[in-house]
């Protein structure tokens, strides 16, 4: 047993950085997300570390003495949380900061630093970003989780097997070391990241005038750090939902689904389970439909009469293929079939999914008339993306349908704050503009001293001229340049943007290989800047194992694959190869050399490593650059808006949604977004508004 510390023991005099970590009881975290806004949990204790001290202050543990909860929050709020001169460090700051704000009623002041965000900008390709994983890799230290588990099992006589969900049931003396280790690791990580990694020069760029530009992670980390308070406010504010309208819509969708099934039943006497292929098979048989594919044949192990598995001459189980009788029914097959009942199944499925996944899904997360979704700022164990774009969860508002009647009805459920209209601000063709920006930056066609093919120079001049028109359509401009349809131009453009190969592109265009080859040659001859940009970025990524975006967000290519690949005529592509870390790739290459040469000779050929191996996924270089730069632009716009007192509510793809109280506010939002990061061509933001999200125009 040990005495609990007193708040007066915490000495913050002369301290500029403090690490903070909370232990909580958050029972609905896995099903409904962070519980701080709903207040359906509580903080059990607060761990604090400075360069000289570490404490764990218990406030809500069972079977132990605790500090007075109200007094503790009041004291720490005054001395620490509201002190603008002390930097606060967290790991997964969104979680702890939201609980602190929930408990105190105030947003923390001063710089809020997150070692999970730092770890992500330092290496966005990691698989895990937990405190334990990061600490193990960077500090060679781990959390005391397993030690705590053993102690709790012994203390509880095996009754408590997972202390992580039962912290409130444990006495202070069991939790103290674990909590203090967590907060100490957080502080150590921050000190290491700040000293060694955030200002580490990863690339030196030489400008045309000969000056040097040093690229580090610091700039993008500062952008993400400035954005963080905005996201906390977005989380707490949430977005209003018309609950009664949602309930009515759910009933209408259910009725529509059931009516469709009744029609099928009336005319065929078949009860269809719309999501079960085996059930739909009965309808196919009734309608004498046989033009469908079947699922793959099932493998079955052969057995003798006693039930023993039979073996072949290699000692492996004998296998026979059992012919499948289950129909393979993709949506396109059902949707385009001449049989009206199959088309009805598609409509019934749409109604069923909209009701169960979206309407009821939204209602499950409504708290006092609003939804407070979890916003995943950057790559983490909770979500986020490798490109820096947001993801959302609990619920995922980015998956709300947008097309068709159902999409419109779903979006009508989202309503603005009282006295406001719903405003939607959408970057117009954000990704193509970024492509044009980089093409004009890397290939300054106006400089006569720079050699380049005439068709490249002419295409760049034409594309830059086209952007002097406010309503320019990139895909139409390229279509006119290449003398092809807009549909074809858009498909090729997006295919190149997303790293799509020729075979996949031909399939998307519904062309034969020969037809596609002619089309691509025409496209690349008339609009060569897209292909050249893509190829040059691939080469840069292979040479440097990284790219950097408009906001200096690094895109790393630190996995490796062999160059020695064989073509498979059956699948009409190269055989897949393993993706390896650099160390594993070098070990694999060494093993290949040892098979070919004697041990002492093999080392002499290790210098040929890059002749046989290359960074993997570099074909995605252009896409990574586009997506990362778009994320930078959107996040910079959100920071700029927040600093003007304007709070976004939903961010989806290239769109920001918020409640608009005046035309002046709408004008500020539009101009701020367009000027967040300036390009070689003008940005354009389309503004639409209405009484709800579904009625904007």
Question: Language model features by range: what are they?
Answer:
Residues 1-2, 18-29, 36-148, 152-697:
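Conserved catalytic core of nucleotide polymerization and phosphodiester-bond processing enzymes
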Residues 12-13:
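Glycine-rich phosphate/diphosphate-binding loops that line cofactor/substrate pockets in enzymes
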Residues 2-8:
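A short, well-structured beta->alpha microelement
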